[in-house]
């Protein structure tokens, strides 16, 4: 009955109630976005596709863009992903993911994305100074991506490479990217 359901929701929470009593497949692990909200989100079709990159809006002058790579080995298992986010709105403007692209090519795709953002902004306003930042995970798989960035040269990728600051008291060698 409804009174029992309301009391049970209050006792165990909406997410657990929906998972246990309404048989919804909600993620149990902690996520950045609440799993109930994730289930309610609706997909949006891209406004255009450039290769395997899906664009949801056109980069604009006077906005800042963050391009983040989560690399993978590229052999058909785990997917590599690149998210393109407009700041300060945190609006997703584009994305790429693939599980057969090797790490060195993942960096080429990141490079093409940052160049596209830069060129698109400059086409709209030739006096603009595009604000583009990029980074990547630096775990074991990320090491190959970081080496590729070193091979290409950071100066050949539009934008500024962001990395974790060295934590006070840590003597560990500095590594580019984020853990």
Residue ranges and their predicted role:
Residues 59-87:
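Gly/Thr-rich phosphate-binding beta-strand-loop-beta motif of the actin/hexokinase/Hsp70
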Residues 21-22, 29-32, 37-38, 42-45, ...:
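Functionally constrained cores in energy, signaling, and assembly domains
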Residues 1-69:
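ATPase catalytic-site recognition across NTP-hydrolyzing enzymes
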Residues 15, 20, 24, 28-32, ...:
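C-terminal nuclease/phosphodiesterase catalytic domains that cleave nucleic-acid phosphodiester bonds
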Residues 86-179:
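Mg2+-dependent endonuclease catalytic cores in nucleic-acid-processing enzymes, primarily RNase H-like
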């Amino acid at each position: 009955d409804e009174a029992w359901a309301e009391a049970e929701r209050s006792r165990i929470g909406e997410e657990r109630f929906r998972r246990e009593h309404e048989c919804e497949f909600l993620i149990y692990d902690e996520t950045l976005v609440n799993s109930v909200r994730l289930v309610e989100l609706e997909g949006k079709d891209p406004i255009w596709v450039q290769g395997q990159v899906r664009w949801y809006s056109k980069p604009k002058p006077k906005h800042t863009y963050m391009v983040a790579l989560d690399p993978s080995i590229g052999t058909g298992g785990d997917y590599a992903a690149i998210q393109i986010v407009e700041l300060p709105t945190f609006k997703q403007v584009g994305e790429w993911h693939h599980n057969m692209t090797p790490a060195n090519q993942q960096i080429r795709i990141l490079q093409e994305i940052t160049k596209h953002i830069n060129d698109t902004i400059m086409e709209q306003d030739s006096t603009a100074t595009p604000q583009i930042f990029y980074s990547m995970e630096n775990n074991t798989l990320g090491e190959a991506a970081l080496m590729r960035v070193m091979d290409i040269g950071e100066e050949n990728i539009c934008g500024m490479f962001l990395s974790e600051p060295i934590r006070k008291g840590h003597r560990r060698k500095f590594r580019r990217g984020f853990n």
